[in-house]
Regions:
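Transmembrane alpha-helices and adjacent helix-loop boundaries
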Residues: 1-268
Length: 268
């Protein structure tokens, strides 16, 4: 396959397409799982940073600030290599699962841990922004009704926080999907790694500059198209949510203005 037509013929090979689509599936699974776990960890970190301000809980705030700043100001690839080398893998991943060998499963687990640790630092700041958007008066109102701080957070603050940050969280999903391509550096079987494996299997990518440019163009072009379709779809969802949110704000503003004008007319 020394021509572009020959390279395009790879896209008509069902085995190659299936192999790459499995990489897409693993990319989505890794990314969504990383975001979900990161939301839990990031929420805890944001709460610690915002509300652990007393003498007894000040150390928790300091730890959360340290965690967030360390992971937000260091590269993801660094943590991927650190976790691959030092992070222990639990016994349940040390076996064949999902059509993967035990070695691949351990790599997948360790790389996912790195992605979760890194992403949770980013999401902590997103959640903290949502927490800051909730009026402190609502917390005081909850306390006056006899609610505990835990109940106030669970029933009053966090629901409003997550409604406010949904578009930003979806944007973070896009970033995490793109960041997952770093996992190819440690042979985790996501989209980019599988694209490189297809080239390697065809003796078109051997690390010695022996590269068929047309094969690279076709396969990496396919990977880029897949990334674009997934992320553009999420991006459009974010835009629609933001437009809907702005529309609701405009309607509320217009309704309030109409009430004021009606009230002034009545008083006149």
């Amino acid at each position: 396959m020394n021509t572009l037509d020959g390279s395009l013929s790879m896209l008509r090979n069902p085995a190659i397409i299936k192999f790459i689509l499995q990489g897409v599936l693993f990319t989505l699974i890794i990314s969504v799982a990383a975001v979900l776990f990161s939301i839990v960890i990031g929420t805890v970190l944001a709460l610690m940073r915002n509300y652990c301000t007393g003498k007894q809980t000040g150390v928790l705030k300091a730890l959360s600030v340290l965690y967030i700043e360390v992971f937000r100001n260091t590269p993801l690839l660094f943590w991927i290599f650190i976790c691959v080398v030092f992070c222990p893998a639990p016994g349940f991943v040390d076996r064949q699962m999902f059509g993967l060998s035990s070695v691949n499963n351990k790599l997948l687990f360790k790389a996912a841990v790195a992605l979760i640790l890194y992403t949770s630092g980013v999401i902590a700041e997103i959640v903290r922004g949502g927490l800051n958007s909730v009026s402190h008066g609502q917390i005081e109102a909850g306390q006056s009704q006899g609610f505990s701080m835990l109940q106030i957070m669970w029933y009053i603050v966090l629901p409003q926080t997550f409604r406010a940050i949904v578009p930003t969280l979806l944007s973070q999903v896009i970033t995490t999907i793109k960041d997952s391509s770093f996992l190819a550096n440690v042979a985790v079987i996501e989209l980019m790694a599988r694209t490189k494996q297809v080239l390697s299997a065809a003796n078109r990518y051997n690390g010695l500059n022996s590269i068929n440019v047309s094969d690279v163009f076709v396969l990496f072009g396919l990977a880029a198209t897949i990334y674009f379709v997934i992320n553009f779809s999420i991006s459009m969802t974010v835009r629609n949510l933001q437009k809907r949110k702005m529309s609701v704000k405009v309607k509320k503003t217009l309704a309030l203005e109409e009430r004021r004008q009606t009230g002034w007319a009545y008083n006149g």
